[in-house]
């Protein structure tokens, strides 16, 4: 698994806390839920930057750096959520269901204004 950390950071902020949750239906491994590397937030990683036109900039961490960590699927029902720091390696899985997966994300930070977030 290639670890992916989406770019939500700014030079002017030290931490971003994200709240990720399903919107219209539950999320699980079948429809591409969030996957996190348990305990991997304690280390700084080398990454490759992948700029996605009209999308988010992706920070790809090589799988060899994350293979020792347990991968946790965040299987969530409606009204359930996960909180995580921007330093946490994470990605969403592949949607095998054939039905679009919808989720919402809210970010909390100590900074005000527009971020260089890849949009």
Give residue ranges: language-model regions.
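Short capping/connector residues at structural and topological boundaries
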Residues: 13, 39-42, 94, 113
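Non-heme Fe(II)/2-oxoglutarate
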Residues: 47-49, 78-83, 87-119
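Double-stranded beta-helix
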Residues: 27-89
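Sterically constrained small-residue positions within well-ordered secondary structures
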Residues: 10, 65, 95-97
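Short, conserved beta-strand element in jelly-roll/cupin
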Residues: 4, 9-29, 51-52, 58-59, ...
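Histidine-centered active-site/metal-ligand motif
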Residues: 1-5, 9-10, 41, 90
